[in-house]
């Protein structure tokens, strides 16, 4: 998509959000970011999202490198859309061997960075263990079902504790 077409779409609000990190290289994304910054300086405000899809995940070269963090009230389609529309989203890219980069309003970036440093890796460890047990179950491990059942709800409990929802 040409810069002029992107500009026309964003200036006329034909899109609900701008896929800021949609390329597969720093070069492609740098141009998108520069265009977005230019539009912001001209008064055009539009929410950002990271990559909306991944191609060629077999070798995983580009899989999971670009993402969107959305601060929605609930994990529902409507709440996610509403959060993005109100600029409660952050575009993020993370290339192998490099520090991640976050793009959005300062407040959103600061919170996303905090979660990246203190929450996401711990949450991922819990999910990894559940995934490992699911794989073992499918492979015929007779004990995996009981161990998986014991893990049930641990990610929800962790999130509730981390965000102070379990304190009454």
PLM regions and their residue ranges:
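Charged catalytic cores and adjacent phosphate/nucleic-acid-binding surfaces used
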Residues: 2-168
């Amino acid at each position: 998509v040409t810069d002029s077409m992107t500009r026309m779409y964003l200036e006329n609000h034909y899109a609900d959000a701008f896929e800021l990190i949609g390329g597969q290289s720093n070069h492609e994304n740098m141009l998108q970011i520069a265009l977005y910054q230019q539009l912001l300086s001209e008064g055009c405000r539009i929410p950002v999202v990271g990559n909306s899809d991944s191609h060629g995940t077999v070798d995983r070269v580009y899989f999971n490198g670009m993402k969107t963090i959305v601060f929605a009230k609930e994990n529902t389609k409507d709440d996610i859309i509403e959060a993005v529309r109100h600029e409660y989203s952050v575009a993020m890219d993370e290339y192998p061997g490099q520090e991640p980069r976050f793009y959005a309003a300062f407040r959103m970036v600061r919170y996303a960075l905090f979660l990246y440093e203190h929450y996401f890796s711990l949450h991922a460890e819990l999910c990894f263990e559940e995934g490992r047990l699911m794989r073992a179950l499918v492979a015929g491990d007779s004990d995996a079902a009981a161990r998986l059942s014991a893990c049930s709800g641990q990610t929800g409990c962790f999130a509730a504790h981390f965000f102070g929802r379990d304190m009454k």
